[in-house]
Amino acid sequence: MQIELKRLQKKLKITFVYVTHDQEEAMTMSDRIAVMRAGKILQLGSPKEIYERPNCRFVADFIGESNIFHGKVEAVNDKLLDIATENGKLLSSGEGFLEGEDIFVSLRPEYLSLSKTALPGFDLRGRVKDFVYTGSVTKTSIEMADGSEVKMSRVEDNSEFKEGDTVYLSWDPPHSVPIHSSGEGEEEHET
């Protein structure tokens, strides 16, 4: 039905305003999405922009599944941020951040990688809690030292790891999204 409505909208060349709480429906049917909270638009953009580059923690948590790391910027090297968290160091890519700034980093589960040793710039270590095979992907839960849980969702089965193994987390820095923590970037947008 969603695809048929999208085809009809294109055929008739009219604008649809569609209100939904179903994220998959919004992503499937929309050219542009407005994520709202308390009557204010927090982010306006294409489904891809909203999903891959959330501008605040609320949007990162609201649209899809996201791992959120809280930390402090230790160094800024061009667009690469060295960030210290309670669970170790990580790298992210972003502009407009200052050394010493308190930030959040959003990472979608499909971008997370596991290894048996720490990779340069990363020393986030956790323990494999469990695996769930869903057919198309394997979902992995990793328990961090502070008790928080990080989610990974990959096509690969990670058969080299088993429950209870110590693993190191990493990702390609441009796949993570740094978010200012002061006000969490939740300014309203003009439409």
Task: Describe the role of every protein-language-model region.
Residues 38, 74-75:
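Short acidic/glycine-rich beta-turn/loop cap or linker motifs at sensory/regulatory domain boundaries
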Residues 24, 48, 57, 69, ...:
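Glycine-centered loop/turn positions within well-structured domains
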Residues 1-58:
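ABC ATPase nucleotide-binding domains
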Residues 46, 58, 72, 125-127:
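Residues located in well-ordered beta-strands
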Residues 66, 76-191:
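Non-catalytic connector elements of ABC transporters
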Residues 46-64, 109-120:
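Short boundary/loop segments of OB/S1/cold-shock single-stranded nucleic-acid-binding domains
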Residues 6, 48-51, 60, 104, ...:
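Solvent-exposed, non-membrane alpha-helical residues enriched in polar/charged side chains
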